[in-house]
């Protein structure tokens, strides 16, 4: 659905290039889902391998939401916005099929007691989102969309392993990946 929405909103004005970007996004989402289903149990559960498809959809649709909220309708007639939509669509699509680690939040435990500061932070986050939801949420989507590359670069600079795939339960450097 995100590829169809962004195509109708802006990419169709770019002709075959816009169609190709939407197709790449759809194909990448299908490959991402297939890889997610086959890698269960061999990938570190704290991270996703590549951007998860809901996050990619949020990134693409978040851009459409922000631009629509700003009053831009039928932007396939505005080349700069159409090309920006193309870049975001391709980025989201291709990032879904990379091996870049994206934090999954699966190790967050909401059943144990939560410190008071966390409750205050959640209330503050809700207040900030209510200031102007489209811009704040799109900014959060962008931060998450870039976070995987930041983690990848940091791990690579520190000399840590960047692959999330465990090939053996017996190798010491893969300890903890099969939880």
Label each residue range with its predicted role.
Residues 45-179:
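C-terminal membrane-associated helical module and adjoining short loops/tails
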Residues 22-61:
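Hydrophobic, well-structured mid-protein blocks that either form specific transmembrane helices
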Residues 1-33:
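Multi-pass membrane catalytic core of lipid/isoprenoid biosynthesis enzymes
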Residues 12, 19, 40, 82-83, ...:
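Generic hydrophobic-segment detector
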């Amino acid at each position: 659905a995100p590829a169809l929405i962004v195509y109708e909103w802006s990419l169709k004005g770019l002709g075959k290039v816009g169609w190709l970007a939407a197709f790449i996004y759809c194909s990448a989402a299908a490959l991402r889902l297939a890889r997610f289903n086959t890698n269960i149990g061999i990938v570190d559960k704290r991270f996703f391998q590549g951007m998860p498809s809901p996050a990619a959809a949020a990134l693409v649709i978040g851009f459409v939401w922000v631009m629509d909220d700003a009053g831009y309708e039928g932007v396939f007639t505005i080349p700069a916005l159409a090309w920006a939509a193309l870049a975001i669509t391709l980025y989201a699509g291709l990032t879904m099929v990379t091996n870049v680690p994206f934090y999954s939040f699966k190790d967050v435990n909401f059943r144990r007691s939560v410190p008071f500061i966390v409750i205050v932070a959640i209330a503050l986050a809700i207040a900030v989102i209510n200031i102007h939801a489209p811009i704040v949420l799109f900014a959060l989507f962008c931060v998450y969309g870039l976070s995987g590359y930041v983690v990848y670069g940091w791990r690579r600079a520190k000399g840590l392993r960047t692959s999330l795939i465990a090939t053996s339960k017996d190798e010491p450097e893969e300890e903890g990946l099969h939880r």
